Amino acid sequence: MNRRNKTIEYRNRQIYAEYIAHIRNGLPVMDAYAACGNSYDLSEESIRKIVAEQARAGP
């Protein structure tokens, strides 16, 4: 893996960590996505999974 790919991978991990932190702090999924600048490329399946997990966890 070249240096550019490592940098992109590191950045994506940071954005994902921020995204998950927003969700854990109670921010709705799509608001959390917007708060991260829509930078992290999430598939619809991933969003559905996160929404389901959030619903199970409750408020």
Where are these regions (language model features)?
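Intrinsic disorder
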Residues: 6-9, 41
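Short, Lys/Arg-enriched N-terminal segment that forms or immediately precedes the first helix
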Residues: 1-5
